[in-house]
Amino acid sequence: MAGSTLRVASVPFVSRDGDCAHNAAQIAACLVDVAREGIALAVFPELCLSGYTDTAKLSRASLDALAEPLDGASIRTVAAAVQRTGVACGVGLIERAPDGRLFNSYVMCLQDGARHCHRKLHAAEHRRIVSGDRHTVFDTGWGVRIGILTGGDSYLVENVRMTALLGASVLIAPHRSGRASRTGEHPLQPLPMMYRSPVDTDTMESMHGWLCARAADNGMFIVFSDGHEASNDQATDAAALIVDPSGLVLATSGTSGAYAAANLDLASIERSRGRQWLAARRPDLYALLAQSAADRSREYDEPPNASARGSVALGFAVVSRHRLMR
């Protein structure tokens, strides 16, 4: 890996609602364009094939009509374009699994014909869309392991850390933000109702800072791509973002809506402070991270006669402010 680079592009794609064939064709055309710029990997947004920012309003029949299997027409179109151009590509869709369940899935099509699918872990888009149950990390011909976290998956620090612990040094973070407010801000994705705050003021600007922190904490590159539907084509500064393992921004799309591109210096991964701190972790201290809130409260109810190990007893005296100390 030493001395090698990987040229990537983050594409803030604007989808046409419900028109998977059109969106797949547009992505295929985009791969031709980025291939001319020497791009090896192009990252498109969450649900870029399916479209729709607000899937919760779709009827059961509409959602079923939108869903495709992983070997469906849209993925085949994209995979064929990858083979023609030599540019690996990540795209999002509503997946219909063989058992009939629906997932918010993201598929990475590689130049060697391999495909890797991540099912969103925290899916709250529609009551019929099921959450995935595992993290996705895989090897590549570039000598790095790549992880995928879709949308709100990357809001949780534990998910990003898990991909790093599974060996990922490049994190693909496709996203789909909400409709723009009157001020032009794009809200982040909602949490499941049971965890939701009555006031949610986080915006894409907030996520910009989170992603830089996640990259630095874990010593990994993060390639973030945000998408909108065609009726909501206002670009944002954070629509495409590439961050290095020190948390420094390598490239953004700016307000033009064009893709962001950067050369990833893969040798910088092991030199990063985040990787050094990963090696210094003490897992025996972190059991609490795997417990629910209810389990935490039971575990840390202090028993009677408990003493703090390693502490030093301190004594205090109350002295009148006018009394002289002797």
Regions found by a protein language model. Give the residues of each.
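A charged helix-plus-loop insertion that forms the helical arch/lid used to bind
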Residues: K57-D71
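Conserved hydrophobic/aromatic positions in well-ordered beta-strands
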Residues: A9, V107-C109, L241, A260
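Active-site catalytic loop in hydrolytic enzyme cores
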Residues: A80, A97-G209, G274-A280
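CN hydrolase (nitrilase-like) catalytic-core segments centered on the catalytic cysteine
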Residues: A73-A88, Y155-Y259
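Active-site beta-strand/loop signature of hydrolases that rely on acidic residues for catalysis
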Residues: N23, V34-A61, V82, G90, ...
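Short beta-strand-to-loop element that shapes/binds the nucleotide-sugar donor at the catalytic cleft/hinge
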Residues: V91-R96
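C-terminal beta-strand edge segments of enzyme domains
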Residues: V137, C212-R214, M220-R326
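N-terminal glycine-/serine-/threonine-rich phosphate-binding loop
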Residues: M1-L41
